[in-house]
Amino acid sequence: MRLYVSGPVSGKTHHEAVGYFESAAKLLVSYGYAVSVPTRFVEPTASHATAMRKCIAELLRCDGLAMLPGWRRSAGACLEVAVATACGMDAKAVEAWLERDAS
């Protein structure tokens, strides 16, 4: 199962955002998930619109969405959760994906 990792990026340095997302990605991978992480494919200089187009396209290639803490404070993450939900994908906190019966 491939999970898209969603969370706040704005207000963080690129280095902080990468660390935040990669920590969650490493944990999810250790539980057997494949992951898609926006900081891996969106250039730090991309406009918000360009970033969201790339993120939504990648999200739709995934099977579920793993939400990082603070996602509700991010307009982009809220949009990603709405798209995932509208498309019938499970959207849960990262920790919820780690429970035995999560997948």
Language-model-derived ranges and their functions:
Residues 1-103:
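Conserved catalytic or regulatory cores that recognize and/or transform ribose-phosphate-containing ligands
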